[in-house]
Amino acid sequence: MAGRGKAIGAGAAKKATSRSSKAGLQFPVGRIARFLKAGKYAERVGAGAPVYLAAVLEYLAAEVLELAGNAARDNKKTRIVPRHIQLAVRNDEELTKLLGGATIASGGVMPNIHQHLLPKKASSSKVSTVDDDDN
């Protein structure tokens, strides 16, 4: 039987690397795997499933945070608050479709004034006087 033998440095254990760092992700792959197993979504969970799910969740979070950061910058703020997340999600067509049924606490409502309630434009009378001068 061939064993490893007494190699130099055999006593030193190799530093453990997380599955998140192996996949190049910030979201915790191990925690997501644990939740998938405990949630009884299926009898067994493949090795790639939690990695893929972590990557998808990380991408969605980055997308929402980028748009919310832009909304905060537009409002001359340095801190993202729920209002900025609401504006970011509702102004993006795909995120609105994904999170359409979700309520964001303290998000407020989207600014909207019906066209019928807006004041009439006065520029139309000026155009008619210019036409009279040309004739």
UniProtKB/Swiss-Prot annotation:
GO terms for molecular function: DNA binding; protein heterodimerization activity; structural constituent of chromatin. It is found in: Nucleus; Chromosome. Keywords: Chromosome, DNA-binding, Nucleosome core, Nucleus. PROSITE patterns: HISTONE_H2A. One of its GO terms (biological process) is heterochromatin formation. CDD domains: HFD_H2A (cd00074). Its main location: nucleus. Expressed preferentially in meristematic tissues of young seedlings, in stigma and ovary but not in pollen. GO terms for cellular component: nucleosome; nucleus. InterPro entries: Histone-fold, Histone_H2A, Histone_H2A/H2B/H3, Histone_H2A_C, Histone_H2A_CS. Core component of nucleosome. Nucleosomes wrap and compact DNA into chromatin, limiting DNA accessibility to the cellular machineries which require DNA as a template. Histones thereby play a central role in transcription regulation, DNA repair, DNA replication and chromosomal stability. DNA accessibility is regulated via a complex set of post-translational modifications of histones, also called histone code, and nucleosome remodeling. Belongs to the histone H2A family. The nucleosome is a histone octamer containing two molecules each of H2A, H2B, H3 and H4 assembled in one H3-H4 heterotetramer and two H2A-H2B heterodimers. The octamer wraps approximately 147 bp of DNA. This is Histone H2A.4. The lineage of its organism: Eukaryota, Viridiplantae, Streptophyta, Embryophyta, Tracheophyta.
